């Protein structure tokens, strides 16, 4: 079974995410045994950010890494697991709010494809970049 990075690389919807993870030097971490739960924004999600945001972040690697690790949780959590929780702590350190009352919401994003199994965890595809704070 492919790992989280291999799944992202093989799916054209995640080209911006792959570029960002590579720029932030997080590829090795996300290829490690983990396990990890990744909330993966699509290219469409990144395109919703204000113009120039991605370029600015790629030039500020510590901030980019902080935002990306806010999308990662240590451990493997399925949709069913997450829906039993109200928050989950990100690798970045901040909590992420979970709401399953109307669909599957993760802070300001909706999970559009849950539970993509990877060798070292699980991916939930989201429609927005999760905003910190």
UniProtKB/Swiss-Prot annotation:
Pfam families: Fasciclin
SMART domains the record matches: FAS1 (SM00554)
InterPro entries referenced in this protein's UniProt entry, alphabetically: Adhesion/Biosynth-related, FAS1_dom_sf, FAS1_domain
Domain FAS1, residue spans: 1-130
Domain of life: Bacteria
Annotated TM spans: none
Paired cysteines (S-S): none
Protein name: Uncharacterized protein sll1735
């Amino acid at each position: 079974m492919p790992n989280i990075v291999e799944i992202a690389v093989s799916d054209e919807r995640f080209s911006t995410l792959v570029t960002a993870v590579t720029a932030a030097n997080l590829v090795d971490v996300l290829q490690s045994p983990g396990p990890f739960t990744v909330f993966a924004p699509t290219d469409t999600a990144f395109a919703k950010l204000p113009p120039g945001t991605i370029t600015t972040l790629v030039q500020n690697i510590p901030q980019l890494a902080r935002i990306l690790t806010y999308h990662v949780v240590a451990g493997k959590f399925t949709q069913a697991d997450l829906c039993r929780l109200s928050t989950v702590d990100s690798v970045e350190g901040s909590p992420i709010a979970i709401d399953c009352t109307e669909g599957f919401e993760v802070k300001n994003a909706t999970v559009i494809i849950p539970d993509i199994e990877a060798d070292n965890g699980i991916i939930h595809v989201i429609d927005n970049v999760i905003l910190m704070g």
